[in-house]
Amino acid sequence: MKSFRPISLTSFLLKTMERLIDRFIRDGTLVRYPLNKNQHAYLAGKSTDTALHNLVGRIERALNNKEYALGVFLDIEGAFNNASLASLLNVMRSKGVGDTVIRWIDFMLSNRIARANSGITNLEVCLWKGFPQGGVLSALMWILVADGLLELLKKTGHFLQGFADDFSILVEGIDLGTVCSVAQFAILQVERWCKEHGLSVNPRKTEMVLFTRKRKLDGFKPIQIFGEELQRSDQVKYLGVILDSKLTWQAHLTSKYNKAVSTFWQCKRIVGKTWGITPKIAHWIYVAIIRPMLSHAGMVAASRTGCCQNNAG
């Protein structure tokens, strides 16, 4: 049932009202009380590129200093469906949002009914938590809630980065035992925050990578989240980019190269010498489909793009 999400059908007038409130909060409240700088989703000037640049920059600095960098990549389970309305309203009050806006959002989210028709019977359920899927305000409401977690880890001196409902903890240090202990404490803070806000993290979808160029891993300690031990991986796919433990970019570039070649040959099947699409359309396919595959997050892997040029040649 987790795969089924209710479609939020709202009128043009309501969408317009949501857009006005969204702009009012962004241009007013968030200017006076800005969100944590480590949130990279749904904000002007932020994107997957800025998130990757920020995270990879810290990892590269740790490797250059011959330190360990332990990354734990978390996914908040059903974030938009399970977010607490009370948590949102508390955050909005702390940010100084006006009472009128808070009451309007409270009324909008508290009076929702989901209807399902199985062909045999109809079912109606009152929704008392979560944000409407596809709603104009939903993205802003979630990053307001998630800002509390980012600020909590900031106060305890830990690095936590967010992109929508994807979070990454990164702990750097010269002593591996200390790095593991600090990471475990950070995870405990995440667990506590999730319990307070009615959310959870799926341990099976949580990935842990130890970034290092050292061969010996003396002092490594097992790390748990919600009672389950995390398994250490050699690589992780984060925001569409494969980060390997030594940050060689080999796995990522090979994956992108193979995908681009496969897509190219699929497109080539619809082109012939005397039939098919025109050269102009073929060029458009390359520019619109193939090139974005290769250029995504290209700046973070710039040091290793030479191997792509060799393969292309």
Q: What kind of feature is each model-predicted range?
A:
Residues G119, F185-L188, L199-D234:
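Short, conserved micro-motifs composed of acidic
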Residues G227-A301:
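Basic, alpha-helical interaction scaffolds
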Residues K66-L70, N202-E207, G276-Y286:
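Short amphipathic alpha-helical interface segments
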Residues I76-K95, G130, S168-K195, R213, ...:
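Catalytic palm subdomain of template-directed nucleic-acid polymerases
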Residues D166, N202-K214, W284, C307, ...:
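A glycine-rich phosphate-binding loop feature that marks nucleotide/adenosyl-phosphate handling sites
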Residues E60-R61, A114-R115, E151-K155, Q266-R269, ...:
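Conserved helix-loop functional segments at active or binding sites
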